[in-house]
């Protein structure tokens, strides 16, 4: 699986992917978040990456250099050159087959290649599948945090050389 930087023509497919995942009801995603403005901003900033296979957009991930959580006293231990991994999303039709682990590894490899030394992320507290994905991949649970009107679990992981 190779993540490539998204381009403006990817925006409709990314938004459709987000909506398909939102319908699963395992997170706070809905018709208002993530929205077209967020997708356009991520593409403009060069922080949105996608995975396509046979022309179909199957996954997306955003790697931010900074996010609000970096300024919050959440108890991160790995604070040297972190990125914030957000909006990690795999097509519902591809879930449950180990591809989520591959997507997470691809996002970590990309972050490492971009010079980041740690990953910080928020996981909706209701999303037990994502919680298992992150803990299974070696992410350290930091805390629970009520942010943006929702309850999140905060995770982090240092990025080591492969």
Regions found by a protein language model. Name each.
Residues 2-16:
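A short beta-loop-alpha structural element at the N-terminal edge
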Residues 8, 21-28, 32-87, 91-93, ...:
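Acetyl-CoA-dependent GNAT
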Residues 9, 13, 34, 57, ...:
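Short alpha-helical
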Residues 90, 96-109, 132-136:
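Conserved acetyl-CoA-binding loop-helix of GNAT-fold acetyltransferases
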Residues 95, 121-131, 147-151:
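Conserved beta-strand-loop-alpha-helix junction that forms the acyl-donor binding cleft
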Residues 104, 111-123:
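Conserved GNAT acetyl-CoA-binding A-motif
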Residues 135-144:
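Conserved acetyl-CoA-binding loop of GNAT-fold acetyltransferases
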């Amino acid at each position: 699986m190779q993540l490539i930087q998204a381009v403006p023509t990817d925006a409709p497919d990314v938004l459709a992917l987000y909506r398909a995942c939102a319908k699963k009801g395992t997170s706070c995603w809905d018709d208002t978040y993530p929205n077209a403005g967020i997708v356009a901003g991520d593409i403009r900033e060069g922080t949105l990456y996608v995975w396509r296979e046979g022309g179909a957009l199957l996954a997306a991930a955003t790697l931010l250099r900074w996010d609000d959580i970096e300024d919050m006293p959440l108890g991160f231990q790995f604070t040297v050159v972190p990125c914030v991994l957000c909006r990690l999303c795999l097509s519902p039709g591809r879930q449950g087959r180990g591809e989520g682990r591959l997507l997470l590894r691809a996002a970590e490899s990309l972050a490492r290649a971009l010079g980041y030394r740690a990953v910080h992320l928020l996981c909706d507290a209701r999303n037990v599948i994502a919680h298992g994905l992150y803990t299974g991949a070696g992410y350290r649970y930091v805390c629970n945090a009520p942010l943006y009107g929702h309850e999140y679990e905060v995770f982090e992981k240092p990025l080591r050389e492969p």
